[in-house]
Amino acid sequence: NTVSSVRFFSAYVQDQISISAHIDIIVGARYDRFEIKGVDIFDNNRAFARTDEKVSPRFGLILKPRDNISIYSSYSQSFLPRSGDQFLSLTPTTQNLAPEKFTNYEAGAKWDIRPNLNVTAALFQLDRTNATTPSPANPLVIINAGTTRTRGLELALTGKITKAWQISGGYTWQDAYIKGNDAIR
């Protein structure tokens, strides 16, 4: 349906700073710029274009009470350009919608029980703004769904059985819901 050209630029910087033998701080930022231009060949060659750019910060704190245990927390932001992660969803009707923005909070622990056996656990919350969905009134029209929130728990166990064999197991629980836009609740 469309012919598009995409230009993308990204730069990322991060530093993990040891405050003491047991405390590290992580500070980082990422800059992204997406430019997409296209023509909808089934809509009288209707042109569309969009440029999205954002600086996304990342902060973390790692506590290491013992050599084999770390407790961490992190905060990060990211975004998804309106064209989507595959650059295929931008159209003349969606080009004016704001990009999706994500804010993630996470806290967890990692424990190396033995050199060949470790356990991880994490709690997380992911808030997303400017999510989109098909309109209940007309599924061909994309509307802003508002804000979503996903909270969850992740557990993982990884171990080496032999030098050549490793086994991993994990569990994730999530609770997600839409906080905004009464039209789609």
Residue ranges and their predicted role:
Residues 83-84, 131-132, 179-182:
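Short, well-ordered secondary-structure micro-motifs
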Residues 96, 141-144:
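Conserved beta-strand positions that form and line the central face of beta-propeller blades
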Residues 4-128, 150, 172-175:
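Structural signature of Gram-negative outer-membrane beta-barrels, strongest in the C-terminal barrel
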Residues 21, 125-127, 144-185:
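Gram-negative outer-membrane beta-barrel transporters
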